[in-house]
UniProtKB/Swiss-Prot annotation:
The chain crosses the membrane at residues 89-109, 127-147, 152-172, 228-248, 267-287, 299-319. Belongs to the GDT1 family. The keyword Methyltransferase does not apply. One of its GO terms (molecular function) is calcium ion transmembrane transporter activity. Keywords: Antiport, Coiled coil, Golgi apparatus, Membrane, Signal, Transmembrane, Transmembrane helix, Transport. This is Putative divalent cation/proton antiporter TMEM165. Putative divalent cation:proton antiporter that exchanges calcium or manganese ions for protons across the Golgi membrane. Mediates the reversible transport of calcium or manganese to the Golgi lumen driven by the proton gradient and possibly the membrane potential generated by V-ATPase. Provides calcium or manganese cofactors to resident Golgi enzymes and contributes to the maintenance of an acidic luminal Golgi pH required for proper functioning of the secretory pathway. Promotes Ca(2+) storage within the Golgi lumen of the mammary epithelial cells to be then secreted into milk. Residues 34-88, 148-151, 249-266, 320-323 are lumenal. Residues 184-211 form a coiled coil. It is found in: Golgi apparatus membrane. It catalyses: Ca(2+)(in) + n H(+)(out) = Ca(2+)(out) + n H(+)(in); Mn(2+)(in) + n H(+)(out) = Mn(2+)(out) + n H(+)(in). Its main location: Golgi. Residues 35-60 are annotated as: Disordered.
Length: 323
């Protein structure tokens, strides 16, 4: 009985101990679990934003054709107008340069200014003659370009087709003149220039004699001269004036004016000056030999063909193209 009473007294005591230990065992687990959950939420970083440069998966790439079918088109590359304007300006300059140099060459070979430079180079210093002639031709080219550029106040459509008509008229006229010329046409113009230069030389020699001392009295009967003639060679002045007067109103001047009205003025100025330099250089270096070898008739016919070619090109090049 005593043993049973002891066992029955221990049973409630054990139950009481178990009930007291259960909260102690559960509380640490719950307290530890709570902070771990909070810390896990705190340490969890927000998702990184998707980078647009990363390659898209196949599933996303498969949507591109569908977007294109629905009207979504990729953005076209943007082209600036500066590159197009620069390219057009370069083409306009090159076209004007080629047109001017070709027209001047076919117009000046065998022309009066060509023979003036050739004959004067045979008598005087070649460098002086070349300098005087080139200065006159450069001045004439610049003036012609300014005259042609002044017409740009008129709408380009009108000046373009008027200049085309003038090219056609010049071409037909040169062809008619070339076909009617005799084979000795160049020799006749050469003799005419020689006679004119001979007359100028006689006047120059007469002026020198008048400025010299008198044989009987020993005094000089000097004619008053301009001071700048003492610093500039008379040969240079003669080449300058003869070339300028011969070129004024010539076919090459009219051609330069027409070209400057429809082409790039800078290209026309540079091309015309280079063309005159080539022709005058050949005349000064070659002299009479080139003058005798050149067939003025052939050069005139070729020039007429070149002028007609420029007129014919207007059928394929619009005035708005810029060249």
């Amino acid at each position: 009985m005593a043993a049973s009473a002891r066992g029955s007294g221990r049973a409630p005591t054990r139950r009481l101990l178990v009930l007291l230990l259960l909260p102690l065992l559960w509380a640490p687990a719950g307290v530890r679990a709570g902070p771990e959950e909070d810390l896990s939420h705190r340490n969890q970083e927000p998702p990184a934003p998707a980078q647009q440069l990363q390659p898209q998966p196949a599933a996303v790439q498969g949507l591109e054709p569908a977007r294109a079918e629905k009207g979504f088109t990729p953005a076209a590359p943007v082209h600036t107008n500066r590159e197009d304007a620069a390219t057009q300006a370069n083409l306009g300059f090159i076209h004007a340069f080629v047109a001017a140099i070709s027209v001047i060459i076919v117009s000046e070979l065998g022309d009066k200014t060509f023979f003036i430079a050739a004959i004067m180079a045979m008598r005087y210093n070649r460098l002086t003659v070349l300098a005087g002639a080139m200065l006159a031709l450069a001045l004439m080219t610049c003036l012609s370009v300014l005259f042609g550029y002044a017409t740009t106040v008129i709408p380009r459509v009108y000046t373009y087709y008027v200049s085309t008509a003038l090219f056609a008229i010049f071409g037909i006229r040169m062809l008619r003149e070339g076909l009617k010329m005799s084979p000795d046409e160049g020799q006749e113009e050469l003799e005419e220039v020689q006679a004119e230069l001979k007359k100028k030389d006689e006047e120059f020699q007469r002026t020198k004699l008048l400025n010299g001392p008198d044989v009987e009295t020993g005094t000089s009967t000097a004619i008053p001269q301009k001071k700048w003639l003492h610093f500039i060679s008379p040969i240079f002045v003669q080449a300058l004036t003869l070339t300028f007067l011969a070129e004024w109103g010539d076919r090459s001047q009219l051609t330069t004016i027409v070209l400057a009205a429809r082409e790039d003025p800078y290209g026309v100025a540079v091309g015309g000056t280079v063309g005159h330099c080539l022709c005058t250089g050949l005349a000064v270096i070659g002299g009479r030999m080139i003058a005798q070898k050149i067939s003025v008739r052939t050069v005139t016919i070729i020039g007429g063909i070149v002028f007609l070619a420029f007129a014919f090109s207007a059928l394929f090049i619009s005035p708005e193209s810029g060249f």
